[in-house]
Amino acid sequence: MSIEDFVQAAQLFLASASQREFISIIGSAALALVSLSTAVLTYMSNRVLTAQVIDTRDQLMTKEIEVVRVKAATEESQKALDRIRRELDEREANIRKQEQNRRVLLQILKQSDEDVWIRHEPLLKPRDHDTRIARRRPIVMLVANNKGGVGKSAVTLNMAAFFDKNQLVQGKKRLLLDLDYQGTSSYVLTKAVDILERQSRAQMLMSEGASELDLFSARIGLNPVLPTTELVPSFYELARHEDRLLMEWLLGESGDDLRYRLSRVLHADIVADQYDLVLIDAPPRLTTGTINGLCASTHLLVPTSFTGVSAEPVANFLAMARAVKDKLNPNLKMIGVVETLTPTGSVSQAAKDARALARLTVERALQTYFPDASIFARDVPRMNAMIDDGLASQDDPKVEAIFEQLCTEIRGKLT
């Protein structure tokens, strides 16, 4: 082979090698491009899938949130529904209770005063009630009669005047508690010391939870007229309070026994330390105040005139007082009946006979219900001075002498 042939053959070979290499490079590039495309496609597919997953997740979260909202709304609606049901149940229960209360009140209205006040159950007497009444500290005297217009307030007022000067225990005070909603004693005493306001405070001592602090807030000093005596006044508004207290008690809305509220106040140790005598002026009927007075009293005094229209109510009152003693206050002592409004001038034989018959009616009632009690020897005559001035014993020597005799007799029975 010649050199030219060799060179030509070599060039052909090189040319052929470059072409193969180029083809190889092109092939490699093509494979790389395919791989890149595949990677790009894979990436893009993953992006699309990721976006779809995210979108799907967002949709699911949106649905879950909506479900939660619906559930919350449902629960709130259920709560509201339950609340409405409870309110309806409460209203229904209240209606039933009111209907039951109405039936109870209708039954009570058919009963006598004695059934309402004395036989009412349950009896929630304070544990130490009987012991405190028996110790007679202080003496608590109820001046009472179911008949009005018999001089009851005049007797109470002039007794207060006597004991203001003649203390049972030196150094202690007296208290006049006016439980008569007409407020006669309160009017006379407040007028005497220039107090013009007519305000009832007696109901404070019969409210649920009443204590000696209520007494100290309610009392009024009577200096200089009765310097050692204090007053708890009453007026017509007392009657409204009494009726409300009675209804609450009968319907079971109070947590204690209404009948013993005054007793807890008057027989507290601190009250016994301050007062030796409490005089209670009671109304002429069996009220919340009257029954509280009977349950709180150590002694009972009954003023009455000896007439046909007055004697029979006295017999009924003594029967009721005996029932109170037997059921509610066994240590209550009946000290006697004082005749009031006795005629001072000449009277007809018919009037004398009527008076004697009335006296006999009272004596028989005493013998039946309180055989240890009697009619006081000293009577209280009908006098203009006593009609015009409730505290006549302060100004009229004759009236003063009458009450000195009567109160001395009474004092001898305060044991």
Language-model segments: which ranges?
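Walker A/P-loop phosphate-binding motif and the immediately C-terminal alpha-helix
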Residues: I133-Y181
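Cytosolic-facing regulatory segments adjacent to core modules
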Residues: E212-L226, E230-I280, R285-L286
